[in-house]
């Protein structure tokens, strides 16, 4: 089965329960924003809307890649500018750059997950054309943080 781009079903419930704290300021018991990570997955993995948390199953491995992925730069506050259909959106404040890596097995998916939460809850699953990398930096450029393009858009 293939990877499928999606917002994990549990993420919506996590939002209502106040589990994830995006942005630069936090309104809950702790005063620190959560730390998010991004992990890459093989094209043969099955990462989709039913993926509730980070898993090592199906994750890429290779020279220069650390299991669990990389830290996501999070200096962008979520926004809510109204609009038709989308009420809130958020995008990491920097591209996801996986240092000099060699990943010779085809991969096509990145999972963003909350590394602060005990369950490493999944935040988003994004797919792209299957690729491999040989001794190079693999970069996923983040979209503009706006109503139309935000990486995570909630209606």
Segments and roles (model prediction):
Residues 1-108, 115-155:
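Small cysteine-rich, disulfide-bonded extracellular modules of the LU/uPAR three-finger superfamily
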């Amino acid at each position: 089965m293939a990877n499928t781009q999606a917002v994990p079903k549990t993420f919506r419930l996590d939002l209502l329960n106040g589990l994830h704290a995006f942005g630069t300021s936090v309104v809950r018991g702790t005063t620190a924003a959560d730390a998010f990570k991004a992990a890459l997955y093989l094209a043969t993995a099955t990462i989709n809307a039913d993926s509730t948390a980070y898993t090592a199953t199906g994750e890429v491995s290779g020279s220069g890649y650390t299991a669990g992925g990389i830290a996501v730069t999070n200096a962008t506050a979520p926004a809510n500018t109204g609009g038709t259909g989308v009420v809130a959106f958020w995008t990491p404040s920097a591209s996801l750059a996986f240092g000099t890596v060699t990943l010779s097995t085809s991969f096509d998916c990145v999972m963003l997950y909350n590394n602060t939460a005990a369950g490493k809850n999944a935040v988003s699953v994004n797919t792209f054309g299957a690729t491999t990398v040989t001794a190079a930096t693999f970069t996923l450029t983040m979209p503009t943080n706006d109503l139309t393009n935000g990486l995570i858009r909630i209606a």
